[in-house]
Amino acid sequence: MSDYYCWGQEVYSPCDGIVVGAEDGYAENEKTNLLADMSNAYKNAHYFDPEKDDIQSVAGNYVIIKYSENVYAALCHLQTGSIQVSVGQMIKKGEVIGRVGHSGNSFAPHLHFQLMDSSDISVANGVPCAFEQYEIFRDNEWQIIENGIPTDKDRIRFW
């Protein structure tokens, strides 16, 4: 996993809030296996049943933060044993919550981040996410964007 630049990097809380979900201890995937991971992704996308299936098989180790009424942040696929927060804990934006991992239904080490309208990740709907600042590659140069929402076609970066 150490060949992946993000694996083991610290993950920071994107907002002030209260931790309403934190699950650790789900086994880290030992290697990447594209065919097996694609098969799992297909199975989870089409046949996942929240009544009988474990959400950790999809999300791996995760933290859910309540930001405001009906807005929750989920940070998933965290490294096993790295979560540093617990349910009920008030946290501040920028506080370390864990490390990037390769747990759950993950093609390779990465951080899955989403805003959603419920603390239950298995039934929540997505909420648009605005970033305070990022850069977009446009007209052959990087341009700073403040308080924007990138589109699915934008090439962006953070620093």
Predicted regions, residues:
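Acidic, glycine-rich catalytic/binding loops that coordinate metals and/or anionic ligands
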Residues: H46-D49, D53-I55, Q89, Q114-W159
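A structural signal for short beta-strand/turn segments enriched in small hydrophobics and glycine
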Residues: G17, G88-V100
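Short, charged beta-turn/beta-strand-edge "cap" motif at the junction between a beta-strand
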Residues: D24-A27, I97-S106
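Short, small/polar residue-rich loop motifs at catalytic or cofactor-binding pockets
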Residues: Y5-W7, V58-A59, I83-Q84
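Polar/charged, compositionally biased leader and regulatory segments
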Residues: M1-E28, R138-W159
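Zn2+-dependent peptidoglycan hydrolase active-site motif and core
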Residues: I18-L78
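Short glycine/proline-centered loop/turn elements that form peptide/ligand docking sites
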Residues: Q84-V87, H102-P109
